Amino acid sequence: MTKGILGKKVGMTQIFTEAGEFIPVTVIEATPNVVLQVKTVETDGYEAVQVGFDDKREVLSNKPAKGHVAKANTAPKRFIREFKNIEGLEVGSEITVDIFEAGDVVDVTGTSKGKGFQGVIKRHGQSRGPMAHGSRYHRRPGSMGPVAPNRVFKNKHLAGRMGGNRVTIQNLEIVQVIPEKNVILIKGNVPGAKKSLITIKSAVKAAK
């Protein structure tokens, strides 16, 4: 069965194991998620559990949103997402960080940091041209393709907006769970800026 929770990225730090091993970790704060709706094949055409995370003021919600969360007897939520393959939850129940434990392998999804308009070297890792005197080719995108089609093919590496994409990093290890602080420590870094939404789910490709 899949396990999942929504949280916010706090930042990075490091911890030491009892053996003295240095481990860089990302701190994720995941306050209790509230189950807002349990979707079934009969009513919705598929099975999923809809959860809400991070309370917001009622004045920022419209009437349909207020009525939706009222069924779960909770406050309006800033983020609403769905998890599949989760069983045994009812509307109004809470999902807390203690569903995970140290050693669990998870997939972490976030929105990568926006870098603005960037060139092909930074955006695609393209090699630069000669920097010596006399060269007129330094950081340009290079050939646009053959003459015959009279157009540029799709997916040609060009300059443009970089970052701000949905990114999933698979098979990250949970180093520690601190239930009293609603905190999960994940080994390594995860996508996104501080305070950004992070989705943590059981790894789909974890070694069994």
UniProtKB/Swiss-Prot annotation:
The species this protein belongs to is Streptococcus thermophilus (strain ATCC BAA-250 / LMG 18311)
- Name of this chain's protein: Large ribosomal subunit protein uL3
> Sorted alphabetically, which PROSITE patterns does this protein's record hold?
RIBOSOMAL_L3 (PS00474)
Tell me where on the tree of life, at the top rank, the source sits: Bacteria
The cross-references to InterPro entries, in alphabetical order and at most eight, read: Ribosomal_uL3 (IPR000597), Ribosomal_uL3_bac/org-type (IPR019927), Ribosomal_uL3_CS (IPR019926), Transl_B-barrel_sf (IPR009000)
Q: Lineage of the native species?
A: Bacteria, Bacillati, Bacillota, Bacilli, Lactobacillales
UniProt lists the family membership as follows: Belongs to the universal ribosomal protein uL3 family.
Q: What does this protein do?
A: One of the primary rRNA binding proteins, it binds directly near the 3'-end of the 23S rRNA, where it nucleates assembly of the 50S subunit.
What biological process terms from GO does the record include?
translation
The protein's matches in Pfam families, at most eight in alphabetical order, are given as:
Ribosomal_L3
* Oligomer and partners: Part of the 50S ribosomal subunit. Forms a cluster with proteins L14 and L19.
**SUPFAM superfamilies cross-referenced by the UniProt entry:** Translation proteins
Q: Which UniProt keywords apply?
A: Ribonucleoprotein, Ribosomal protein, RNA-binding, rRNA-binding
Gene Ontology annotations for the cellular component aspect, listed alphabetically: cytosolic large ribosomal subunit
Q: List the disulfide bonds.
A: none
Which region ranges are annotated with the description Disordered? 123-146
One GO MF term, please?
structural constituent of ribosome
